[in-house]
Amino acid sequence: MPNNKVKENPMSLSPGAKFRLAVKTHHPLQIVGTINPYCAMMAKSIGHQAIYLSGGGIANASYGLPDLGITTLNDVLVDVERITNACDLPLLVDIDTGFGGAFNIARTIKAMEKAGAAAVHMEDQVAQKRCGHRPNKAIVSQQEMVDRVKAAVDARINPEFVIMARTDALAVEGMDSAIERAIACVEAGADMIFPEAMTELKQYEQFSTALRSATGKPVPILANITEFGQTPLYSGEQLAAVNVDMVLYPLSAFRAMNKAAENVYRHLLEHGNQEALLDQMQTRKELYAYLHYHEYEDKLDQLFSQPS
C-alpha cells in the first residue's frame, strides 16, 4: 500500500520538535557549541543540524567569569535570544541547576521556550556548582533532582520542548547511583539523559541498557566530548556503537578561537605588524558571506537609490 503520511516540514516545526527530529534522524547527532550568533550562523552554513550554548562558555566569554554557578538566568537569556534571532537551528541550552527552586525553575523553562530555545539540560549538582569535569563536585539528593525535573516538565508550554536531565553522580557516588538517578529523572518526565564526565566507553551502553530495561523505551543519551576533561575523545562511530544518540562538542570552536586570538595578540606585541598572520585569518569576503552582507547592501540601494 502507498504511504500517504505527509512528511513533516522542518521549517514548520517548533524548535523542540526540530531538535527531536534531528536526534531521531542522525546517528549520532553532532551538537556543536556556538558561543555567539555569528558562530551559530557559521555552523548552520557549514551543515550542522543542532547547536549548543554552554553555561561555562557564557560565564567565560560574555562575563569574564569562571564556570562556578555565578551567572544568572537573565545573563543566559541575553545570549540565547541573540543566537535564536540570528539562526534557526535547534539550540540546546545549559541552564546549570535551573537557577533556584521549583518556581525559579518554572520561570527558567518558560523564559527559555519564549526565547526560542529547543532544549535545555539541567543537572543534579548543588546550587554552588562546579564545572562537570573538575574535582570536588557536590550533588543534591536524588529526590531533589527528581523534584527539579518535575518542576521543569510541569512548566513547559509546548510538550515538544526538550527537558534533558544531567547527572554528575558518577564522580561523586559511582555508576550505580548515576544510573538510578537517570532512571528516576526519566520516570519524572525527562525526555533525554546527559551522563556527565564518563570515563569509559562502555558506561554509555550501561546507561542505555538500564534505561531501556527500567522504562520500557529507548531514552536518547548525550555524550559530552569536551577537550581536556575526564572523558576520552571518542569518535562518533565509537559512540554510536554504544547507543549514544547525541555527541556534544561544547567549547571546541571557542577554545580554538581563544588560542588564535592569543597568538594574534602576542604576535602584534612582538612584531608590531599582522601581515605574517593574514593567511591564518578569515578574509573580509569570507566574513561577509556568512552574514549575507551584500544582500543588505543591495536592499539599501533598492530603498534609497537616487533617481537618475
From Swiss-Prot:
Q: Which SUPFAM superfamilies match?
A: Phosphoenolpyruvate/pyruvate domain (SSF51621)
Q: Which cofactor does it need?
A: Mg(2+)
Q: Do you know which Pfam families this protein is assigned to?
A: PEP_mutase
Q: Which UniProt keywords apply?
A: Lyase, Magnesium, Metal-binding
Molecular-function annotations in GO: magnesium ion binding; methylisocitrate lyase activity
UniProt: substrate binding residues: 54-56, 131-132, 166, 196, 224-226, 255, 284
The biological pathway it contributes to is: Organic acid metabolism; propanoate degradation
Keyword check for Magnesium, yes or no. Answer: yes
One GO BP annotation is: propionate catabolic process, 2-methylcitrate cycle
Where on the tree of life does the source sit, at the highest rank?
Bacteria
Please write the reaction equations for the catalytic activity of this protein.
(2S,3R)-3-hydroxybutane-1,2,3-tricarboxylate = pyruvate + succinate
**Enzyme Commission (EC) number:** 4.1.3.30
Top-tier EC class: lyase
Residues binding Mg(2+) are 94, 96
Family as reported in the entry's similarity comment: Belongs to the isocitrate lyase/PEP mutase superfamily. Methylisocitrate lyase family.
Subunit organization: Homotetramer; dimer of dimers.
| Described purpose of this protein according to its UniProt entry | Involved in the catabolism of short chain fatty acids (SCFA) via the 2-methylcitrate cycle I (propionate degradation route). Catalyzes the thermodynamically favored C-C bond cleavage reaction of (2R,3S)-2-methylisocitrate to yield pyruvate and succinate via an alpha-carboxy-carbanion intermediate.
Extract the NCBIfam families matched here: PRK11320.1 (NF008455), prpB (TIGR02317)
Question: Under what name is this protein listed?
Answer: 2-methylisocitrate lyase
